[in-house]
Amino acid sequence: MYSLNRLPRSAAFKSSANLLRRNASTTSAGGVNVVGFENKGPAATSSLTVAIKAGSRYETTPGVAHVLKSFAYKATASASALRTAREAELYGGVLSAALTREHLLLSAEFLRGDEEHFLNVLASVLSSSQFYRHELSELVLPVVEAETISSQAIPSTIALDLAHSLAFRRGLGNSLYANKNYPVSIDDVKSFGEAAFAKSNIAVIGTGVSTEALAKAVSNAFGAGTSSGSKLSTPKANYYGGETRVPLDIHAPATATPTMVIAFGTSSPASADLKVLKHLLGGETSVKWTPGASPLAQAADKIPGASAKAFLLPYSDAALFGVVLSAPTSAETKTLAQEVASIVKNAGEFKEEEVKRAVAKATFEDAASTETLSGFVAAAGPAALVGSVPEAQSFSGVSASSISKAAGELLKGKPTVVSIGNISVLPYADELGL
């Protein structure tokens, strides 16, 4: 096994914490926080994203955040949904909307120089969406229902959604998907949208455009159009934990396999130690067509068609850390779960050399994640909402002892266990020694 101490380290590795700050800058324009990220070389395209603090944790009615996301780019005071779509096509741009547990993200990607048009489109969505009743029934709800049904066909998606509900109950525990058993009215959407689209609740993130040019365009586009109400708020997240078991629907697609999630949570933001611990447990491979050398990868490799991967889902005031595992049959999933539980219970027992390798992986992942638009927005969104620029995580203080301490604190909490499959076969949490 090669030692990292013998390998030359690049300057980027040694100063990764400065990579983002080098080209990103922030300012305020007309009461809206603005973050611009200029490319080092000439770029033919630019992008704009409005980050709105209106994720599912802030919703006042179950599913209203999902419905509001699907109302994006419908009729506004200045254009119909058809006109908005056609003009985007004529400019060669792409409009999209995404929902996370903390943010609603409205994005536009386009040829450089067209930022004024697309910023006006985004501003009109926030300031003058009409929320017509016929659009809700004819255009929005069918899409919402289709997205919900699609998510229910993927056991891992169901398991992670249920895991959040068990771990955090309300707030972060709210589902990302609307449920037809809890109808959302047009008045619910209007009320939530009015609060969500307040200037104090949004930030604009631009890539391939200077902060100065972006700030000027934001001042012109947003002006006094958006409301200036107070921010949406939610109580601080608390971790609880729990267990639930769901039969795998006989109507599920053939690709659906028995799945389990074994997780633990924190009531504070994710630490550098947890980011490194995710790579220590692993499940992913660094070389294609090989099983991988991490404990989880080795465990899954014993069962053909099985997988076990560590995950870390960070939020502003909490985090969920765990393993999602699956196998072709419930009996095989039980066998894998027993080995995974043993690995998790010994998560703090790693050698210094193993920690160094995991730190290198975590540093690379942290830096590489911002190279894509979605990754940069995920990093810049929370920072922009508080008027700062995103910064890469520092892993300089991570060691085998700090990992052991972090893992010990994590495992003190009540586990969150979700089982999907043949529930007469899949193990209970106490049977796994958790």
Curated annotation (Swiss-Prot):
It is a peripheral membrane protein. GO terms for biological process: mitochondrial electron transport, ubiquinol to cytochrome c. Keywords: Electron transport, Membrane, Mitochondrion, Mitochondrion inner membrane, Respiratory chain, Transit peptide, Transport. GO terms for molecular function: metal ion binding; ubiquinol-cytochrome-c reductase activity. Component of the ubiquinol-cytochrome c oxidoreductase (cytochrome b-c1 complex, complex III, CIII), a multisubunit enzyme composed of 10 subunits. The complex is composed of 3 respiratory subunits cytochrome b (COB), cytochrome c1 (CYT1) and Rieske protein (RIP1), 2 core protein subunits COR1 and QCR2, and 5 low-molecular weight protein subunits QCR6, QCR7, QCR8, QCR9 and QCR10. Belongs to the peptidase M16 family. UQCRC2/QCR2 subfamily. This is Cytochrome b-c1 complex subunit 2, mitochondrial. The gene is QCR2.
